[in-house]
Amino acid sequence: MFINGEWINRKDIEVKNPYNNEIIGYIPSLSRNETKEAIKIAEEHKSTMKNLSPTIRYNILMKIASELSKNKRELAKLITIDVGKPIKQSIIEVDRTITTFKFSAFYSRELRGETIPFDDGMVITKREPVGLVGAITPFNFPLNLFAHKIAPAIAMGNSIVAHPSSKAPMITIELTKIIEKVLKSKKIPLGVFNLLTGEGHIVGDEIVKNNKINKLSFTGSVEVGESITKKAGFKKITLELGGNNPMIILKDANINKAVESCMSGKFLNSGQVCISVGRVLIEQEVADEFINKIVEKVKKLKIGNPLDEDTNISSLISLDSAERVEKLINKSIGQGGKLICGGKRENSIIYPTILEITADNILANIEIFAPVLPIIRVNDMNEALNQANNSNYGLHSGVFTQDINKALYFADNLEYGGVLINNSPTFRIDNMPFGGIKHSGLGREGIKYAIDEMSEIKTIIVNTK
């Protein structure tokens, strides 16, 4: 952990490579009192960040992006052994992280207010930093989702305490070393950024509850997100939570395109993506064609060591996660689900699995977070819409059709934060608004939108008469 410019290197928690279970490092586990002290230090540095000019913040962010670019391959390898993500996907994550910092740099110089005239003068608005941002991040995109919180916070001029998942903290430690180097080069006090490692029920809980935190940004499970809403008090919160994202395929769709999109949308990071395809809702007339084509492609996926360049599917984040998914597959089959391919577990690897199910099956109503694709046949577009909306989740959805009127109808009527037309739900560019409704979250990320969430509007009234 990194607090006020000091590294603390206790070996409290083992960090293991989920693919082979080898120990790759250790991290300290902060106590609640240590967490409180770190938050106090970060609070004392709020004015330091606020007083940095937009140009200095821009230069900090661009320099971080530059340092990341120098070591892309090494950083990608660390993501892979940290998470079990195939190396070619880890390289993409590093590239996206660089872009996230560059976008944040751009927006750091685009902070704008308004002028509103009235008879005796004018109203001026300006955006000011909220103060101290607490960032809690997940394991599945341990570098880019970390960047999606800290980069906008820096752009807006906030101090930061960041708590990465204890399942995949090693890459955030490397990023923190880069941030330390950049801050030192700019002669900025290091207490503006603090990395707090440890157990979520201690470190994360204190960040959530502590009144010195002005803004909390959390990515993780619905269960923890719901708990946060009850504990956070009056601080601003952004929650990026789970999803059971429907991919709707109508009978006029380009089936080949739908298959390709579903392959990338379902099996990226072995299905451990919050916007992964959760279920396919497909009209009867084209269901057989789609199933036959996607099964053919799934059987060609390379399963194995995530460091191999041609690997497509590797381990889940832990053996416990894989065993949970195995039980879900078996329960689905017990409820009448038809296993089309896969269904096999080998240690922490779940082989790519396709099942045909009905709407009352367990897999139709939960976030699976694994390379498991449930397919549900529907009679028409209205049934597809109703089934898609019959969910507590509301993150992303996808619709495949060649009829613009149908596409716009679904765009208007799907109860989701994002609607993708002729694309799977698993699409995100790093400067678009991103987030869900219902139990899938509160607020929006995406650099400009995260900056808005991490700022306050100050209104200045000038009487000129």
UniProtKB/Swiss-Prot annotation:
Q: Which leading EC class covers this enzyme? A: oxidoreductase
Query: Which positions in this protein are listed as binding NAD(+)?
Result: 220-225
Question: Keyword NAD: yes or no?
Answer: yes
Supply the Gene3D superfamilies for this chain: Aldehyde Dehydrogenase, Chain A, domain 1, Aldehyde Dehydrogenase, Chain A, domain 2
Under the heading Pfam families, the entry gives:
Aldedh
Listed GO MF terms? lactaldehyde dehydrogenase (NAD+) activity
Provide this UniProt record's keywords sorted from A to Z. Answer: NAD, Oxidoreductase
Query: Which reaction is recorded as catalysed by this protein?
Result: (S)-lactaldehyde + NAD(+) + H2O = (S)-lactate + NADH + 2 H(+)
Which pathway is this protein assigned to? Answer: Cofactor biosynthesis; coenzyme F420 biosynthesis
Active site: residue positions: 240, 274
Tell whether NAD is among the UniProt keywords.
Answer: yes
This enzyme's EC code(s): 1.2.1.22
Q: Which family does it belong to?
A: Belongs to the aldehyde dehydrogenase family.
Function summary? Involved in F420 biosynthesis through the oxidation of lactaldehyde to lactate.
PANTHER family attached here?
A: ALDEHYDE DEHYDROGENASE (PTHR42991:SF1)
The record's subunit annotation is: Homotetramer.
Q: What is this protein called?
A: Lactaldehyde dehydrogenase
